[in-house]
Design a protein with these regions (language model features):
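Active-site anion-handling motifs in enzyme catalytic cores
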Residues: 1-410
């Protein structure tokens, strides 16, 4: 069996975690499977993938020349392509039993509108080549810019299954394909447990980090972003300044009472956010930044590390997913529906701060509430572990149903 996963985002521990868990669970069900990950752009390939995984750089019709080449490929059902990169992609499509849309952010929808067409265009090729495809628990929407909705609708309706990782995305998708079955599960990263023995050994070898954790009775993990990369929030410079001011004061207040602050970069390679976190690191006694570019300390290691912390303050979606998975109380700062939707589904909205409502007092009060409710919060997360894992695995179960159906047809 051969599975192609398209639209994979690299240089991001969150996307890496969701993809790696997907790969691991599919491989458990089908030990003989070959999985090809098509990485968008020229980003770093995911570290520590199993030997049955191959990674390629995905063709994207961005330039005029690439768009012309892609149009020819679609019109000829993939038989003619004047782009070498697209020929590689077409070859992988042809050899695959099914194509999966990688578990990631809302790349289909208004949020990343300027890039969306390069995602949708690949599905035109899949439809022309009569290849089955499935949306493997990404986020999607909103779809208020209606000029593209007929295209979106066509691509969604041609799929074998639409599985989404949050209820808000589900609502958006149902609004434009009301007659199509849409399933809502949980983020793919939940479905595969962390190898604790292997990652404990990695932590033992990471001497500086281990000493820092031992020196502080309680450590708070942090993922932070100034959102200067975001297509909407980057237009308002006040947001970045607000983030800087709020977090500098917050870190100062908690380190004064004995907490250690552990920054956990979510981006690496071309998209490294290590330097941004350095700007918040006031000293080396009470602040520590986990290395970003050492492949040993991958997404699974980050999950294990978060499991050793007292709490997490997360502006990055997957750091909060890691926290929930590992039973570590956390406060999420939500800038897209993916985080808000998860917190609503898990009845954790009291620990979610909308970016528009973020202030010094709100963050301070929410953290104090977490401390007050700590034991109850931690127990709640630990009790929900099996539920979250099972919910996430439903995406793989749906894939299994499709594969069985395809085998029956053959």
């Amino acid at each position: 069996m051969r599975i192609l996963v398209i639209n994979c985002h690299s240089d991001n521990r969150g996307d890496e975690a969701a993809v790696h868990a997907m790969v691991d669970e599919i491989s458990v069900a089908h030990p003989e499977v070959e999985i090809i990950l098509a990485i968008r752009g020229a980003g770093t390939k995911y570290p520590n993938m199993p030997s049955n995984v191959k990674m390629i750089h995905q063709f994207m019709p961005i330039s005029f020349k690439a768009k012309v080449a892609h149009r020819i490929a679609v019109l000829t059902d993939g038989k003619i392509s004047i782009s070498l990169n697209e020929r590689v992609l077409i070859s992988e499509i042809s050899k695959s039993d099914i194509i999966l849309h990688a578990p990631g952010g809302p790349s289909i929808g208004d949020t990343y509108y300027s890039d969306e067409s390069t995602y949708l265009a690949i599905y035109d090729l899949l439809i022309a080549m009569h290849k089955p495809y499935m949306f493997y628990a990404p986020s999607m929407g909103p779809f208020q810019r209606e000029e593209r909705n007929s295209w979106r609708k066509k691509i969604l309706e041609h799929s074998e299954a639409i599985v989404l990782r949050d209820p808000i995305s589900e609502k958006y998708v149902r609004s434009i394909v009301p007659n199509k079955k849409v399933s809502s599960t949980l983020d793919s990263a939940f479905q595969h447990d962390v190898n604790t023995e292997q990652n404990q050994e990695k932590l033992n070898q990471y001497i500086d980090l281990k000493r820092f954790l031992e020196k502080h009775e309680k450590c708070v993990g942090v993922t932070i972003t100034d959102l200067q990369w975001h297509p909407v929030y980057s237009k308002d410079p006040a947001i970045a300044k607000n983030v800087r001011d709020i977090f500098h004061e917050f870190f100062s207040s908690i380190t004064k009472i004995g907490y250690g602050v552990v920054f956990i970069p979510q981006l690496y390679g071309n998209a490294n956010d290590y330097d941004l976190m350095c700007k918040f690191c006031c000293d080396t006694n009470d602040y520590f930044i986990v290395t970003a570019n050492d492949g040993r300390y991958d997404a699974y290691f980050q999950q294990y590390l978060i499991g050793q912390l007292y709490a997490v303050i997360g502006m990055r979606y997957h750091s909060n997913i890691f926290s929930a998975k590992m039973g570590t109380p956390f406060i999420s700062i939500s800038y897209e529906q993916k985080m808000k939707g998860f917190m609503e589904k898990m009845d954790l909205v009291e620990y979610c701060i909308d970016l528009q409502n973020l202030s010094k007092d709100v963050l301070k009060n929410r953290f104090e509430y977490l401390v007050k409710q700590y034991d109850e919060y931690k127990k709640f997360l630990c009790n929900k572990h099996t539920f979250m894992k099972t919910e996430a695995h439903k995406t793989t179960d749906i894939l299994e149903t499709i594969l069985e159906r395809e085998d029956t047809v053959i």
